[in-house]
């Protein structure tokens, strides 16, 4: 590999999940030996109202998720679930359940299917 990243962030424009890279299950690519894979620093981006890799209304939550995910020791006091619920209540007037918050931060593999087909 020309690059050896410390962290890999997977967008929702792909069906790939962290375990696909960690278990080297992606066709045509060998992820073994990469620093991020060895450290298990492979993460799927959240999926709120839109794919969070691009600027969207969910961008503040994406940045908070990135900070907490990449620097957990510095953001240990941040309750991401509570912040997400507060954000959705303030911005949209919507009260999210724990299950809805979980789906934002652990999007299903199928969430990337439409985007993967569009390429």
Each predicted region: which residue ranges?
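Binding-cleft/active-site segments that stabilize strongly anionic ligands or cofactors
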Residues: 1-60, 69, 74-76, 81-86, ...
């Amino acid at each position: 590999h020309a690059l050896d990243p410390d962290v890999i962030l997977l967008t929702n424009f792909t069906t790939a999940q962290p375990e696909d890279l960690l278990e080297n299950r992606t066709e045509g690519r060998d992820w073994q030996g990469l620093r991020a894979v060895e450290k298990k620093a492979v993460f799927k981006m959240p999926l709120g109202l839109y794919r969070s890799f691009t600027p969207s209304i969910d961008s503040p939550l994406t940045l908070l998720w990135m900070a907490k995910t990449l620097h957990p020791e510095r953001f240990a006091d941040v309750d991401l679930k509570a912040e997400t619920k507060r954000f959705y209540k303030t911005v949209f007037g919507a009260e999210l359940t724990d299950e809805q918050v979980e789906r934002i931060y652990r999007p299903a593999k199928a969430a990337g299917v439409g985007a993967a087909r569009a390429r």
